């Protein structure tokens, strides 16, 4: 699973996920299913935001090839993927600027058009069940919830799906592709079955014990079969801006 994740996802997604897991004392090499789940969730958050802007009249527009002369602002602020301190700093800044109610938990996005925080969910289970779990945890009508599944289903607060149908279809297609590729490699069952995942976790722990201190050699080559999985949703300018925004505070 770890090899699949590193080949399947954008390197920046992988890097941010590793930092997030280490912040909570988790090891991507051991908890590989969680590694895959967090990478998937983070990519969906980026896809949700990509190409969506607000123009000088505060109207929402979609731009896939940037016009440098256009006065555009990204419609969504991406909060997911930042360390906790920086995430709360962004949330507090948004609340102070807009006057919206501060959430109890760190949300994933902020929508400048609708003036609301958004909680994104990606589930391997039934969307209604996961939606209720999210709603019960958040306990706030102010935070909008949008759930996606690997089977193409979705559910959102008051059936308000925020994005246009084409943008949501890109996300659903990507999730379905990830599912199919996992299944073709025999990874899907352990990804969705907690009992099988627990068995795999024990296996990972056992395999790491004898050689924990040995250096490892990592191959960054992408197999031909996985080249079709390379995410195409992030333009180079957006990637550079996001990398600078998320990672500049790592250096002292």
From Swiss-Prot:
Site for Important for efficient shutoff activity and nuclear localization, residues: 195, 198-199
Keyword Mitochondrion: no
Superkingdom of origin organism: Viruses
Localization (cell): Host cytoplasm; Host nucleus
GO molecular function: RNA binding
Domain notes: The probable endonuclease active site in the N-terminus and the basic amino acid cluster in the C-terminus are important for the shutoff activity. The C-terminus acts as a nuclear localization signal. The C-terminus is recruited to host protein complexes involved in nuclear Pol II RNA processing.
Its biological purpose: Plays a major role in the shutoff of the host protein expression by cleaving mRNAs probably via an endonuclease activity. This host shutoff allows the virus to escape from the host antiviral response. Hijacks host RNA splicing machinery to selectively target host RNAs containing introns for destruction. This may explain the preferential degradation of RNAs that have undergone co- or post-transcriptional processing.
Similarity comment: family membership: Belongs to the influenza viruses PA-X family.
Descriptive protein name: Protein PA-X
Organism in which the protein naturally occurs: Influenza A virus (strain A/Chicken/Hong Kong/96.1/2002 H5N1 genotype Y)
Gene (UniProt): PA
């Amino acid at each position: 699973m770890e090899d699949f994740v590193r080949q399947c996802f954008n390197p920046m997604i992988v890097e941010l996920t590793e930092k997030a897991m280490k912040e909570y004392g988790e090891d991507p090499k051991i908890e590989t299913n969680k590694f895959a789940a967090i990478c998937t969730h983070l990519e969906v958050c980026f896809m949700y935001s990509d190409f969506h802007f607000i123009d000088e009249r505060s109207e929402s527009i979609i731009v896939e090839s940037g016009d440098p002369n256009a006065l555009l602002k990204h419609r969504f602020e991406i909060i997911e993927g930042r360390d906790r301190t920086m995430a709360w700093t962004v949330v507090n800044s948004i609340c102070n600027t807009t006057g919206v109610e501060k959430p109890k938990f760190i949300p994933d996005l902020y929508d400048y058009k609708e003036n609301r925080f958004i909680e994104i969910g990606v589930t391997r289970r039934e969307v209604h069940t996961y939606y209720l779990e999210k709603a019960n945890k958040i306990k706030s009508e102010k935070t909008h919830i949008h759930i996606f599944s690997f089977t193409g289903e979705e559910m959102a607060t008051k059936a308000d799906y925020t994005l246009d149908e084409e943008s949501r279809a890109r996300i659903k297609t990507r999730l379905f592709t990830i599912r199919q590729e996992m299944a073709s490699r025999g990874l899907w069952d352990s990804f969705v079955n907690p009992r099988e995942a627990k068995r795999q976790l024990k296996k990972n722990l056992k395999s790491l014990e004898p050689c924990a201190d040995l250096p490892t050699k990592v191959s960054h080559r992408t197999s031909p079969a996985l080249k079709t999985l390379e995410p195409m949703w992030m333009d180079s300018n957006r990637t550079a801006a996001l990398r600078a925004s998320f990672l500049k505070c790592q250096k002292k």
